[in-house]
């Protein structure tokens, strides 16, 4: 996932990339001569601090949160800041310098336009009816409007268009164990003799194989580990004018010297360290997992770290058993998190950062 904020950074990137995909599907991309982005409500009011405008440009250039190469994206933004270059759907290769659309390796690339963050229209006092995080993207051919879409970033990186119903990932339209509340979840699990994780796995297997579910979960876990490792190796100051010093790396070195065996006495210190490390990596613009949001993305890795290192029966298990524990952990967490998303909110704009 992209750094900083799930609703203000990940969502806008997804929305603008989705807009480009719709242009490609409609065979309109090569006709675009100009593009414009309007930001509304909270996206406009706090967009500068969350990297909203930059994220929208990156999405227009073909970057997506799941696979974004931070170095490539920043190189593109650096060039944009110098000459305004905006390659719709990205560059076919490093050597590509033309302005004409084309394709390479089966991927479609659009025209290279000129458009900067400063040209976006910010409307912080205008809140669209559906959600406070609204954005409109318009593509022009000369003065003619080719396409215009309004998107809403509803929290957790999820994006909807207009009156579209909110969904995330593959839709579990006919799961064997549908539930809409905690009480229903517990009752279904008890009646079926299943744990919450087992019930959730059965539901997930209605749209993908168990092997695919496991691979996806373990892939997410690997990204979390890489995020933590990257943060613990950083030194210096966090980005921004306040000159906040990085703390996770130094704290990790001190804690390793004081508690090399990870004794129970220091469990809370390790949990807090992992959460801080993820948050600092997010502030640096590194890759984090939006679970449930970027602002709260340190909690799941921190709790999982505790589970893997301090839970009896897991700490000294073999690799296969530890992977099973990770899968169960994520399935149970997803079941509970889905209820928060459905029955309340995971959007900081709606429930605040503590709500996340």
Map each language-model feature to its residues.
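A structural-propensity feature for long, helix-poor, extended segments
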Residues: 30-69, 76-83, 321-356
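C-terminal regulatory domains involved in ligand/effector binding and gene-expression control
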Residues: 59, 64-259
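Catalytic-loop motifs flanking and including active-site residues across diverse enzymes
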Residues: 11-15, 52, 296-300, 356
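Solvent-exposed alpha-helices and their adjacent loops that cap or buttress functional pockets
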Residues: 28-30, 127-131, 280-282
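Alpha-helical support elements that line or immediately flank enzyme active sites
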Residues: 7-24, 301-315
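Accessory "access/gating" subregions that flank catalytic or transport cores
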Residues: 207-349
């Amino acid at each position: 996932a992209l750094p900083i904020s799930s609703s203000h950074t990940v969502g806008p990137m997804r929305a603008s990339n989705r807009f480009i995909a719709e242009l490609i599907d409609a065979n309109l991309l090569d006709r675009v001569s100009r593009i414009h982005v309007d930001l509304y409500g909270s996206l406009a009011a706090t967009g500068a601090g969350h990297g909203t405008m930059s994220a929208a440009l990156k999405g227009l250039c073909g970057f997506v949160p799941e696979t974004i190469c931070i170095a490539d994206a920043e190189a593109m933004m650096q060039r944009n800041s110098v000459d305004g270059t905006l390659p719709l759907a990205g560059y076919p290769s490093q050597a590509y310098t033309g302005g004409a659309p084309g394709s390479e390796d089966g991927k479609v690339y659009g025209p290279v336009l000129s458009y900067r963050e400063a040209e976006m229209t910010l409307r912080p006092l205008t809140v669209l009816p559906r959600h406070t995080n609204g954005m409109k993207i318009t593509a022009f051919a000369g003065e003619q409007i080719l396409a215009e879409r309004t998107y809403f970033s509803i929290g957790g990186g999820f994006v909807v268009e207009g009156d579209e119903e909110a969904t995330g990932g593959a839709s579990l339209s006919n799961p064997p164990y549908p539930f809409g509340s905690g009480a229903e979840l517990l009752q279904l699990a008890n009646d079926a003799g299943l744990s919450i994780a087992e019930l959730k796995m059965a539901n997930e297997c209605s749209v993908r194989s168990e092997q695919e579910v496991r691979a996806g979960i373990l892939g997410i876990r690997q990204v979390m580990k890489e995020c933590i490792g990257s943060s613990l190796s950083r030194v210096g100051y966090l980005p921004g004018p306040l000159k906040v010093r990085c703390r996770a790396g130094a704290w990790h070195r001190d804690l390793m010297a004081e508690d090399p065996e990870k004794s129970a006495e220091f469990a809370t210190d390790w949990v807090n360290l992992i959460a801080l490390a993820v948050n600092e990596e997010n502030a640096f613009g590194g890759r984090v997992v939006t679970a449930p949001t970027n602002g709260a993305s340190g909690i799941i890795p921190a709790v999982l770290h505790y589970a893997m290192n301090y839970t009896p029966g897991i700490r000294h298990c073999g690799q296969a058993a530890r992977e099973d524990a990770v899968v169960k952990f994520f399935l149970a967490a997803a079941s509970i998190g889905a209820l928060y998303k459905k029955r309340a909110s995971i959007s900081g704009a709606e429930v605040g950062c503590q709500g996340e």
